[in-house]
Amino acid sequence: AGFSGLADFVFAMQGLGSGTISLFGSAEMQSKYLPDVRTGQKIAAFALTEPEAGSDAAALTTTAKIEDDFFVLDGEKTLISNGGIADYYTVFAKTGEAPGTRGISAFVVDADTPGVEITERIKVIAPHPLARIRFNKCRIPLAQQIGKGGEGFKMAMATLDIFRSTAAAASLGFARHALDEALERVKSRKMFGSPMSNLKLIQAKLGDMSLDIDASALLIYRAAWTKDNSAEKITREAAMAKLFATEAAPTCYRRSCTNFWWIRCGFRIRC
């Protein structure tokens, strides 16, 4: 993770798209979709966010109604990572079993299903694309529903909890890489007749980076340990790990670039 933005694509995005199936899908569904994702032959995507339903995921308006032996999906999703290149989407839609979050279900929708339309490819600087997707009378078999009806919101939150920890772990790798580069620099470059590493101010800055890195690691390991010990929810632990680690990583890179590698990391501007 410390050397490539692909960590975001491979761990967070590829895993996020298939995570709900791993956690809640039937054995048949898992055997159908997961092997090709695991080998990298197919790409998965997680379709929850909508134009008017971001953090308030329960406000989504995409619907899935039963007609004969099919669910018919109608609605729009946006800011979908891997959108436009994914082979299938894990889609969350209202099925109406109950009001609010208890009326949301989860489905697997193959990208080549009639009615799946990529309406916008969102321009971003990222290792994976983002897109807006419309489901226009998209018919899928009843067997494409993940788990029980009405439990989609709970599935989405459980999946996000795990991959918040994954995003935090990737950020930890970035931060450690920044520290490794800084240590290499201060040991090899001399100032005032001795290596930079002998300067107290430099040692303090390296200490700050190490503190952020170790704190990130401990929060991440706590979230993982809690989940491994059968906790039903790790929302608090995962959110704390992601918040701290994703803020620590750019801070460590900024310290590394501005204090030790300003020539390598900077840009030359001709006025």
Describe each region flagged by the PLM.
Residues 59, 112-141:
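Flexible, small-/acidic-enriched active-site or ligand-binding loops
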Residues 78-83, 124-125, 162-166:
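Glycine-rich phosphate/pyrophosphate-binding beta-alpha loops
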Residues 70, 74-117:
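A short core secondary-structure module
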Residues 16-24:
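Helix-loop "lid/cap" segments that line or gate small-molecule binding pockets
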Residues 7-14:
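Active-site nucleophile and cofactor-binding loops and adjacent substrate-binding regions
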Residues 1, 12, 24-29, 36, ...:
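Alpha-helical interface subdomain recognition
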Residues 52-63:
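Active-site-adjacent elements of ketosynthase-type condensing enzymes
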Residues 40-48:
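A short, Trp-centered hydrophobic/proline-enriched beta-strand micro-motif
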